[in-house]
Amino acid sequence: MDKLIIKGGKKLAGEVTVSGSKNASLPIFISTILAPAEHEISNVPFLRDINTTIKVLEQLGAKVDGNGNIVKIDTTGVDNFEATYELVKTMRASVLVLGPLLARFGKARVSLPGGCAIGARPINLHLKGLAAMGADINLTHGYVEAKAKQLKGARINFDVSTVGGTEHLMMAAATAKGETILENAAREPEIVDLANVLTKMGARIDGAGTDTIRISGVKELGPVSHRVMPDRIEAGTFMIAAAITGGDIKVRNMQLEHLDALVFKLQDAGVEIINKDNVVRVKGPRKIKGVNIKTRPYPGFPTDMQAQFMALMCLADSASVISENIFENRFMHVSELMRFGADITTEGNTATVKGVKKLSGAPVMATDLRASACLILAGLAADNTTEVSRIYHLDRGYESIEKKLAGLGADIVRVQE
């Protein structure tokens, strides 16, 4: 098992290029099931979750060939409508194959994601939507079994905003009979990217990026060539890396408009952000100001940036309050930040962070993907040496982050424990 060793206290400088979006790539890969053809997806990041998705597609009968950041997917040979627990258990997004398989074959059998409690996770919204489109759904032995001669258009109002549910039903509706209307749809940029892919295939979609999406079903879809959007969470993580170290960096291949909520809060904290010719310059302040945040569905402050922003607030000149309104149990990084000397108290979904003058390097353990990034950021700013273990979480969502940070002047290496 690998770990990262960081010698902190270095101001980051230079340029870094953001990889393609993981959260956009996964549903885009899965959408190719809908069209039996040869597809080409570029700007794909090298990540564990991408490899898992490729294995799922191959298990279903697709041929996948990767060359650098370009992946060719041939789905003409897909002849299996079952996604087994052995693969699905490692990645929750795998359940998105259910709708496309059902649309293509009229039946599908997909394992529930590992540790997924139907009532506690919005997968029930996926199933409710498919049922509204005419699917007969049964849960047996940990699998979702679905049948439908042909999915039919329906009006679906999500109880809560769900990115996966919106993506799932948008794919399923692309070849359904009639019009499907998704109300209270999620508005994330990754949904727009998926809609762009489906539209290139021949789908008729209107309203992606708003809370009402209309999909007029077509008889069939064709091949697609598409470049995945940049990863806005990786971009935001590098912006905070510059801020927390008092650095001065340029970030390439990012779309700043996707991070408005974060940008405003960073500016409130004293960070200077300049966007020129699609290159974003980020200069850390001499003093970090305390700023309150509340996570919200897009275009609000992203929950996937909450942990990283908390690391920044640990060194602020005043207290800040962080409210997590999207996910439960998303303060698991707090106890690890306190090992650096951070002053944080939590109550329910709220954390109060009292800034300290400095952090001190410590051995810490990552608990999830974004917590991994948070601990790295703290380590970059801390005195002395920090060791971050269990970084396999990190490899799910960040492509070679230690190499990119080292390229900015960080003293960071990956070693085997």
Swiss-Prot record:
Its main location: cytoplasm. It is found in: Cytoplasm. GO terms for cellular component: cytoplasm. The modification 2-(S-cysteinyl)pyruvic acid O-phosphothioketal is found at residue 116. Keywords: Cell cycle, Cell division, Cell shape, Cell wall biogenesis/degradation, Cytoplasm, Peptidoglycan synthesis, Pyruvate, Transferase. It catalyses: phosphoenolpyruvate + UDP-N-acetyl-alpha-D-glucosamine = UDP-N-acetyl-3-O-(1-carboxyvinyl)-alpha-D-glucosamine + phosphate. Phosphoenolpyruvate binds at residues 22-23. One of its GO terms (molecular function) is UDP-N-acetylglucosamine 1-carboxyvinyltransferase activity. InterPro entries: Enolpyruvate_Tfrase_dom, Enolpyruvate_Tfrase_sf, MurA_subfamily, RNA3'P_cycl/enolpyr_Trfase_a/b, UDP_GlcNAc_COvinyl_MurA. Its EC number is 2.5.1.7. Pfam families: EPSP_synthase (PF00275). UDP-N-acetyl-alpha-D-glucosamine binds at residues 92, 304, 326. Pathway: Cell wall biogenesis; peptidoglycan biosynthesis. The active site is at residue 116. Cell wall formation. Adds enolpyruvyl to UDP-N-acetylglucosamine. Belongs to the EPSP synthase family. MurA subfamily. This is UDP-N-acetylglucosamine 1-carboxyvinyltransferase. The lineage of its organism: Bacteria, Pseudomonadati, Thermodesulfobacteriota, Desulfuromonadia, Geobacterales.
